[in-house]
């Protein structure tokens, strides 16, 4: 069984990749998200599979590098899909959007550098 990490897995693309891999491939999947855009901290697609033994969902803020310590370091695939998005958000707090998105990318790259992960998809 292959292992995948989906950073930003609570969003539209991430949750659909999760669904596809669970339904069509033999993968164990860790989904990481802060779920700031979901209703009540839940994403319908992820809720459908919450009890799957092949799915682990973590609510983490990856702008803090130490939170990466909770992850494995040997995923076959890493999907980096996390970002603060939305025109309203960008217009309201542009500096915060840049800070958060920069830290997400920087911390992910630092963690990948110290890991033995296979392929990375951005």
Ranges and model annotations:
Residues 6-7, 80, 119-122:
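Structural signature of the Rossmann-like NAD(P)-dependent dehydrogenase/reductase core
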């Amino acid at each position: 069984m292959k292992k995948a990490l989906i950073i930003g897995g609570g969003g539209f693309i991430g949750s659909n990749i999760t669904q596809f891999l669970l339904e069509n491939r033999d993968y164990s999947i860790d989904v990481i998200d802060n779920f700031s855009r979901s209703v009540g901290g839940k994403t319908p697609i992820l809720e459908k599979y919450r009890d799957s033994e092949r799915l682990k969902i973590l609510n983490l803020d990856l702008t803090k590098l130490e939170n990466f310590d909770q992850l494995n370091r040997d995923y076959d695939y890493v999907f980096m899909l996390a970002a603060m998005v939305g025109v309203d958000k960008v217009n309201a707090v542009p500096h915060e959007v840049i800070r958060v998105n920069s830290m997400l990318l920087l911390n992910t790259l630092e963690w990948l550098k110290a890991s033995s992960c296979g392929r990375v998809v951005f």
